[in-house]
C-alpha cells in the first residue's frame, strides 16, 4: 500500500475514496469499493450519499464528538457530497483533493462548514 500522505491524485486509482479505504485497511478494516462512474458523471451525481450506509457507517448525532477515524463527507463548492476525508485525533483531517497530493489539513472553519455528514464505522463504536 502506498503511504497515505503525498499520493498523486488519479481518479479511481488514487483519489479521496481510495485514500479512505486505505486508511481503514491500515486499521484492519476492509471497506467495499464500487464501480465508480466516469469522473464527469460523478461530478454531476456523486455516489457518496448512496454508499456510506452500505459500507457500514452510521451518522453521528449533533452532540456526538468526533473521534479519530470518523469519516467526513464534504460538499466542496457543491450542494451534494463530493469529497470524503478522515478525522484525526489532533484536529486534522486526512484527505485527497482532486489534482493535489493527499495530505493532512486542519479541520478548520471552511472544512467544517463544508461538512455534510459526520460518520462513524460500526466497527469503531465506543
Predicted regions, residues:
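Short acidic/glycine-rich loop or secondary-structure boundary segments that cap or lie
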Residues: 29-33, 42-43
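Active-site nucleophilic cysteine motif
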Residues: 8-27
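Surface-exposed patches in mature extracellular/periplasmic domains of secreted proteins
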Residues: 11-13, 31-36
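Short, Lys/Arg-rich amphipathic alpha-helical interaction segments
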Residues: 102-126
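...with weaker cross-activation on analogous glycine-rich loops/strands in unrelated enzymes
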Residues: 37-101, 107
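Glycine-rich, flexible loop/turn motifs
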Residues: 5, 30, 103
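Active-site-adjacent structural segments surrounding the nucleophilic cysteine of cysteine proteases
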Residues: 1-7
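Detector for glycine-centered tight turns/loop "hinges" at secondary-structure junctions
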Residues: 28-29, 91
Amino acid at each position: 500500500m502506498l503511504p497515505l500522505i503525498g499520493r498523486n491524485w488519479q481518479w479511481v486509482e488514487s483519489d479521496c475514496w481510495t485514500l479512505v479505504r486505505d486508511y481503514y485497511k491500515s486499521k484492519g478494516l476492509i471497506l467495499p469499493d464500487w464501480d465508480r462512474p466516469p469522473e464527469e458523471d460523478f461530478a454531476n451525481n456523486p455516489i457518496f450519499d448512496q454508499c456510506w450506509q452500505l459500507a457500514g457507517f452510521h451518522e453521528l448525532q449533533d452532540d456526538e464528538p468526533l473521534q479519530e477515524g470518523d469519516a467526513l463527507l464534504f460538499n466542496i463548492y457543491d450542494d451534494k457530497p463530493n469529497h470524503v476525508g478522515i478525522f484525526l485525533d489532533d484536529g486534522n483531517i486526512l484527505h485527497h483533493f482532486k489534482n493535489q497530493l493527499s495530505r493532512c489539513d486542519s479541520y478548520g472553519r471552511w472544512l467544517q462548514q463544508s461538512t455534510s455528514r459526520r460518520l462513524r464505522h460500526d466497527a469503531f463504536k465506543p
